[in-house]
């Protein structure tokens, strides 16, 4: 009996893996042992919750329902939560097949969809991260994950062995407290994952994530020494899993799948929505702007107004069918992000510098949004694949678990 460990490294791009191999020795070694997708297509938009959800479901946001970190629920834009996922997930399918499933810190999974579960360390205030200017309070879907107490006994046993019993409250102090809680939270989830994978009777599927690279890049910027450290930190956590499996004699019998939710790249400018569209209800989804509209006529009027500023309307086929008359999606070309308002010193401006020097979720086909996929383990071919679709991640993991087809993708291994 051996585990499949699925790790998501937030914000680690295809370009990072190609350009910084010396800083990413564990990912590089894994890529040489198995299958490596050099450029995995991002989702639309290439933001955190759509990316996490597509990894689990293998379908696009029109089907799984999570079309942004913020989604329109018919009355307001709010943060998406695990209860918003409409499509079957890897964890649900694995449970239904009688497999043991451990979800440790991976967002967008419900507690009931795992046999061993711990919420994401950031779940208590649902993405109330350092970069959120006006956080939306956590809703019940996220609070339910943070209230969950694992009943499997696995995490309690890990604590008895000397590993951390829980994670710090990231929101109990200043920004330094937040950063250290993030680094600690990521490490704890991976330490638990590594220990479970190396245990005598491991879960069949272990799903975890590392958030640090995304947060640090947003604040420090592309290729900043701090950002490069964050990439190396994520790589070192992958190495913890590899070493634990090696020490236990399970490395050759276990499967590791590592991917990311989106890439990262320089933000050249920001467009300020309160000046572009005063009085509208909108949500800034990185380089995509969602505007609540009352039907196609209002959407056309908004599109005409934004076109004056070089902003084009997206077709909207990535939106769930019932939202296409209620939400219009727009994008600006280049490395442009939308922000609710200008900083105080630029009050009233239409555009200016971004608050965050590095970002993601830009116009479709922006190379910096591309990500990667690495799979290594029994039966996984040693090969490199230039390009693959987002849906191929779930299809590949499902096949490796013997679950049959899942989603709209193809098996890559």
Model regions: which residues?
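Substrate-binding rim/cap in mid-to-C-terminal beta-strand-loop elements of soluble/periplasmic
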Residues: 277-303, 356-400
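His/Asp/Glu-rich, glycine-adjacent segments
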Residues: 60-221
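Beta-strand elements within well-structured catalytic alpha/beta cores of enzymes
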Residues: 2-17, 29-30, 55, 94, ...
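Histidine-centered active-site/metal-ligand motif
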Residues: 217-220, 262, 350, 354, ...
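Short catalytic/ligand-binding loop motif for oxyanion handling, primarily in non-cytosolic enzymes
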Residues: 15-16, 48-49, 64, 109-116, ...
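Short, structured active-site-proximal loop/turn typified by the sulfatase FGly-forming signature C/S-X-P-X-R
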Residues: 17-54, 58-59, 63, 102
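A structural signal for well-ordered alpha-helical segments within the folded catalytic domains
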Residues: 2, 24-25, 50, 85-92, ...
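Secreted, luminal/periplasmic, and some membrane-associated catalytic domains
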Residues: 9, 38, 70-87, 92-97, ...
């Amino acid at each position: 009996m051996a585990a499949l460990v699925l790790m998501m490294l937030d914000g680690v791009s295809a370009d990072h893996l190609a350009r910084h191999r010396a800083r990413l020795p564990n990912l590089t070694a894994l890529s040489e042992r198995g299958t490596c997708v050099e450029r995995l297509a991002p989702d639309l938009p290439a933001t955190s919750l759509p990316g996490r959800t597509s990894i689990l479901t293998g379908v696009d946001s029109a089907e799984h329902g999570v079309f942004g970190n913020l989604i329109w629920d018919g009355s307001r834009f709010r943060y998406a939560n695990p209860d918003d996922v409409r499509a079957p997930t890897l964890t649900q399918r694995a449970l239904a097949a009688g497999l043991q499933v451990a979800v440790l810190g991976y967002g967008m999974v419900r507690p009931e969809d795992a046999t061993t579960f711990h919420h994401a360390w950031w779940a208590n205030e649902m993405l109330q991260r350092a970069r959120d200017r006006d956080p939306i309070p956590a809703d019940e879907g996220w609070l339910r994950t943070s209230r969950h107490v694992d009943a499997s006994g696995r995490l309690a046993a890990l604590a008895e062995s000397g590993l951390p019993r829980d994670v710090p409250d990231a929101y109990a102090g200043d920004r330094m407290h937040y950063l250290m809680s993030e680094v600690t939270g990521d490490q704890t989830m991976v330490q638990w994952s590594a220990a479970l994978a190396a245990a005598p009777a491991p879960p069949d599927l272990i799903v975890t994530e590392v958030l640090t690279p995304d947060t640090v890049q947003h604040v420090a910027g592309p290729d900043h020494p701090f950002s490069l450290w964050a990439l190396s930190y994520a790589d070192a956590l992958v190495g913890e899993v590899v070493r634990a499996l090696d020490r236990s004699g399970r490395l050759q019998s276990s499967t590791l799948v590592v991917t990311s939710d989106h890439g990262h790249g320089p933000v050249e400018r920001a467009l300020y929505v309160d000046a572009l569209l005063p009085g509208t209800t909108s949500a800034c989804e990185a380089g995509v702007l969602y505007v609540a509209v009352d039907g196609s006529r209002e959407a056309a009027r908004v599109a005409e107004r934004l076109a004056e500023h070089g902003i084009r309307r997206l077709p909207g086929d990535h939106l769930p069918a019932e939202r296409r008359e209620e939400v219009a999606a727009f994008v600006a070309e280049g490395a442009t992000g939308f922000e609710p308002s200008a900083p105080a010193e630029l009050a009233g401006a239409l555009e200016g510098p971004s608050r965050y020097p590095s970002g993601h979720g830009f116009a479709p086909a922006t190379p910096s949004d591309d990500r990667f996929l690495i799979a290594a383990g029994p039966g996984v071919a040693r090969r490199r694949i230039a390009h693959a679709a987002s849906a191929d991640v779930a299809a590949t993991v499902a096949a490796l678990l013997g679950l049959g087809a899942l989603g709209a993708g193809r098996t890559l291994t």
